[in-house]
């Protein structure tokens, strides 16, 4: 039993520590992200509201029960004198009691709207538009979450690559430190040279500590974004330099116009404004409804007998507001103003989309050029470091020359790696700008 428990614990630990790939992170963010889950609940609420609005167009069945007690009873006096009759002495005029003190009524009613001027239909369409707007909002949040996942993943790649470069730099410096100490013991260099190399080594170690801290923070941010119980180390991948082929800018802009969820949201807002105006105009018309009821009560229609009886009623109800201080007209005007505002917002959004696509495209082009230049610089710095190291062994170059060459080589390698990361981030920006990053 203990062995089984140990195996389960080891298996759970290995799963928790398994490397997180980009594809898995994108899948987890769609499944687990709390913002997306909250938006899904909002979408369900909108769907339920649509079902409620549709139900208002159907017949409604109501049941009611009433029981009351009256301390007075209506009486109907019989006019004896008018009938030509006379009452004996000491007799009061006869009367008929209508009903009794206790009144009870059970009713089952059916109500059906007949004409509302299009109010109910507009309300259903407005609710359905709200559902589509929530779906569009969910798509937008999915794209934003996917972009955050891309950004964190590539930031993690940058830190991992930088750490390797810093570790290689540290190894070179440690070799130089050993050589400097050997030369110092042989009285060929001063203590200053050894101290200079040692200080540079400490600088790189501090950078490695900061890199480790930054990687831990990236893991924490990724776990929060993916709603994971524990952090998982992000897998390291090989970043391939870009090829020479680039996407056509006009094609990217056309894709953005087709797929950006913000545009769909604006157009759904315009449709909602049109429906709101239509709904406000519908209040100019009367509401007509039919109603039928089945009653069982005491007293019934025959108040004189005061007995239990059943009966039915059927009728129509007309309600027409004739004056409301221009409230309906102002609602129509408000809907028209909202429609005009959304039209302007659409124009602004189109400009912003155009800018987003061009910005991502320019950033990608700039990153490609930076990669090419950084690659040449890295090769030159590698050759320079090799030459200076050889010259130092021959006694031509100083320790300071080697440290400067090593630092320049490290910076060139970091520049090349950062340019490569910037290219991949620019590609993510393009995917976000054209609305296809979550696909």
Model-derived features with residue positions:
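Sec/SRP-type N-terminal targeting helices
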Residues: 37-41, 54-55, 98-100, 114-142, ...
């Amino acid at each position: 039993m203990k062995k089984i428990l140990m195996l389960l614990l080891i298996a759970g630990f290995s799963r928790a520590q398994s490397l997180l790939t980009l594809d898995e992170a994108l899948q987890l963010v769609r499944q687990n992200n709390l913002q997306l889950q909250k938006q899904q609940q909002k979408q369900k609420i909108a769907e339920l509201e649509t079902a409620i609005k549709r139900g208002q167009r159907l017949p409604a069945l109501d049941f009611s029960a009433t029981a009351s007690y009256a301390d007075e009873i209506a009486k109907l006096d019989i006019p004896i004198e008018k009938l030509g009759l006379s009452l004996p002495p000491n007799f009061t005029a006869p009367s008929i009691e209508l009903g009794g003190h206790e009144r009870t009524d059970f009713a089952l009613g059916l109500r059906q709207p007949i004409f509302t001027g299009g109010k109910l239909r507009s309300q259903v369409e407005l609710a359905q538009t709200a559902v589509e707007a929530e779906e569009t909002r969910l798509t937008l949040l999915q794209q934003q979450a996917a972009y955050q996942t891309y950004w964190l993943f590539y930031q993690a790649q940058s830190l991992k690559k930088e750490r390797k470069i810093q570790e290689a730099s540290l190894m070179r410096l440690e070799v130089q430190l050993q050589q400097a100490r050997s030369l110092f013991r042989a009285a060929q260099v001063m203590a200053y040279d050894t101290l200079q190399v040692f200080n540079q080594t400490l600088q790189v170690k501090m950078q490695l500590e900061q890199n480790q801290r930054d990687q831990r923070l990236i893991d924490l941010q990724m776990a929060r974004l993916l709603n994971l119980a524990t952090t998982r180390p992000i897998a390291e991948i090989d970043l391939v330099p870009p090829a020479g082929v680039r996407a056509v800018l006009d094609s990217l802009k056309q894709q953005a116009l087709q797929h950006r969820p913000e545009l769909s949201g604006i157009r759904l807002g315009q449709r909602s404004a049109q429906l709101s105006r239509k709904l406000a105009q519908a209040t100019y018309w009367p509401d007509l409804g039919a109603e039928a009821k089945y009653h069982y009560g005491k007293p019934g229609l025959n108040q004189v007998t005061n007995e239990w009886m059943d009966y039915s009623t059927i009728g129509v109800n007309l309600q027409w507001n004739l004056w409301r201080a221009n409230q309906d007209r102002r609602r129509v005007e408000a809907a028209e103003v909202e429609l005009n505002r959304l039209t302007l917002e659409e124009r602004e959004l189109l400009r912003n989309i155009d800018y987003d696509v061009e910005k991502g495209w320019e950033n990608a082009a700039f990153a490609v050029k930076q990669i090419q230049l950084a690659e040449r610089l890295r090769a030159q710095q590698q050759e320079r470091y090799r030459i200076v190291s050889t010259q130092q062994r021959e006694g031509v170059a100083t320790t300071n020359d080697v440290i400067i060459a090593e630092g320049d080589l490290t910076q060139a390698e970091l520049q090349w790696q950062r340019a490569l990361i910037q290219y991949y981030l620019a590609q993510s920006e393009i995917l976000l700008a054209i609305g296809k990053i979550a696909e």
